[in-house]
Swiss-Prot record:
It is found in: Cytoplasm. The gene is tsaD. It comes from Rickettsia akari (strain Hartford). Its cofactor is Fe(2+). PANTHER family: TRNA N6-ADENOSINE THREONYLCARBAMOYLTRANSFERASE (PTHR11735), TRNA N6-ADENOSINE THREONYLCARBAMOYLTRANSFERASE, MITOCHONDRIAL (PTHR11735:SF6). NCBIfam families: gcp_kae1, RPE3, T6A_TsaD_YgjD. This is tRNA N6-adenosine threonylcarbamoyltransferase. Substrate binds at residues 134-138, 167, 180, 322. It is an enzyme of class 2 (transferase). It holds the Pfam family TsaD.
Length: 386
């Protein structure tokens, strides 16, 4: 039986998985680093890389035990080799290549985005081609998935990724990290029409997106509600920049102090009802933007493919776990005769099962990678063969 070992370390989750040729997930271990990064309000690349270094052995041991698999039974090792935080990518890739060399088994370098792109084929056996909305903390793009390694980017964000925007707005509201799930929960209790936020380039006529202006609008609203002037805010930003330059050993103390300051500002001026309304209005605006862009993406997709027997839109990445957006985008897709498909929640966020599956497809096509492959911090889906 073919068994593919997958390794994922592109951001702050250390993940290892084993799947079979029949798309059965024998084990899928994820070691989260959320508590290590929470005090900073975001992912610190150096901490992430060091944690991957200490977590990979543990994750591999647990996966082998849970799947009742011996290392010699592994057919190939697939590992995220970009894009992502380069320190973590290198740690995972080197770990995988060491196993490959020792076991004399093929190594397969996987583009992290391809892992997300193919997840629906792992879970639902979706045929090619299909339209993909990849929405995560680091990326937001519409992609025509025409076949293995054949991707056409129809449009992408020109500034912030949608998941990053969720996290930053959550941070403004003093919500826990990661911010996406926190925003979603608060939004359930708020009025989505309480505040009107801008929808940048929503009428551009193409598939590109922008979230920076929306993020700024939320920040401005919060400052106005808190009656904090721009000078004080700019001073706080300059303090933040100075703090970043301090020694790593002092960072925890500095960020704790900064977070306490932010906490006092939010808790003093914004009650729970206001926070809920901001979260709901923000999430509603995101839904409006993505729904409009899905329509643009469908038109662009239909210009480059003539396969209309299976009209599927896949949403993948961490943002795909948002139930509100699932419902909004599903209704939008139905209007155009498409079915919206999204992976189970545990496969929306970063995981190694998707990496192992991408490895399986490449293994079946004998697309192996030399051990001298250089990991990449940036690696477009359209350049996946380079």
């Amino acid at each position: 039986m073919i068994k593919i070992l997958g390794i994922e370390s592109s951001c702050d989750d250390t993940a290892v998985s084993i799947i079979t040729e029949n798309r059965e997930i024998l084990s899928n271990i994820i070691i989260s680093q959320n508590t290590e990064h929470a005090v900073f309000g975001g992912v610190v690349p150096e901490i992430a890389a060091r944690s991957h270094l200490s977590n990979l052995d543990k994750a591999l041991t647990n996966v082998l035990k849970e799947s009742n698999t011996k290392l010699i039974e592994i057919s190939a090792i697939a590992a995220t080799s970009g894009p992502g935080l380069i320190g973590g990518v290198i740690v995972g890739s080197m770990f995988a290549r060491s196993l490959s060399s020792t076991l004399k088994k093929p190594f397969i370098a996987i583009n992290h985005l391809e892992g997300h792109a193919l997840t629906a084929r792992l879970t639902d056996n979706i045929p090619y081609p299909y339209l993909l909305l990849l929405a995560s903390g680091g990326h937001c793009q519409f992609v025509a998935v025409l076949g293995l390694g054949k991707y056409k980017i129809l449009g992408s964000t020109i500034d912030d990724a949608v998941g990053e925007t969720f996290d930053k707005v959550a941070k403004m509201l003093n919500l826990a990290f990661p911010g996406g799930p926190e925003i979603e929960q608060k939004a359930k209790l708020g009025d989505p029409h309480k505040y009107k936020f801008p929808k940048p380039i929503i009428n551009s006529g193409n598939c590109n997106m922008s979230f920076s202006g929306l993020k700024t609008a939320v920040r401005t609203l919060i400052m106005n509600l808190q009656e904090i002037n721009y000078n004080e805010c700019n001073h706080l930003e300059s303090v933040r920049q100075d703090e970043v330059q301090e020694e790593f050993a002092q960072r925890t103390k500095v960020h704790e102090h900064r977070r306490k300051l932010q906490n006092s500002l939010v808790s003093s001026f914004l009650n729970d009802s206001v926070i809920n309304d901001i979260a709901a209005s923000f999430q509603f605006t995101i839904g409006e933007i993505l729904s409009s862009k899905v329509q643009d993406a469908i038109r662009a997709y239909e210009q480059i493919t003539n396969n209309f027997d299976k009209k599927n839109i896949i949403i993948a990445g961490g943002v795909a776990a948002n139930k509100y957006l699932q419902e909004i985008l599903s209704n939008c897709a139905k209007t155009y005769g498409y079915q919206l498909i999204y992976p189970p929640i545990h496969l929306c966020t970063d995981n190694a099962a998707m990496i192992a599956y991408a490895g399986l497809e490449r293994y079946n096509n004998k697309l192996f990678t030399p051990l001298n492959f250089c990991p990449k911090a940036r690696w477009s889906l359209e350049d996946i063969s380079k």
